[in-house]
Amino acid sequence: DQLADYAQIFDEQTEYDQQQIDKIIEVFDQYRILTAIHHGNLGLKALNEQVEAALLEHLPDFQKQGDWYIGRPVMMTYNDYQLGLSNGDIGLCFKHRTQLNECEVYFPSLKKWIAAARLPKNIQTAFALTIHKSQGSEFDYVYIVIPKRDSHLLSMELLYTAITRAQKKVTI
């Protein structure tokens, strides 16, 4: 169970060095759930909530602090010049290095730490991404969630984009 393995990484660590952080990010970047839609039970929000709930079951000792918890991946959905973050930047939430009971987010593409409290409230959880937002990214394993009903958003081109995000395996 990939989710249990992911949770265990965070459960076992109390402090992180850069090598451990890089390993955690490598594990996180192996898998991604992609969807064409934002709303509904197969939409982005619902999929992220389902993964989040399952993950928190594997981290019984950790309490959510509002929307924040150790292991939460987040994606910026717009540019924030004050923070130096761009639309599409993805970070991972870790225990704060100096503040007890606080979280901070590491953005690996920028090699930058930002306290979770400084990030915008509408930052998006990123276990699942829209196919559109995944363009330019690659993952070892991709799970593509397709709506049961016809969706004007789903085209052969979009499906091709989703499939080509996978390096090793695609599950539809």
Q: What does each of the following model-derived ranges do?
A:
Residues 3-172:
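Core RecA-like ATPase module of SF1/SF2 helicases and allied nucleic-acid translocases
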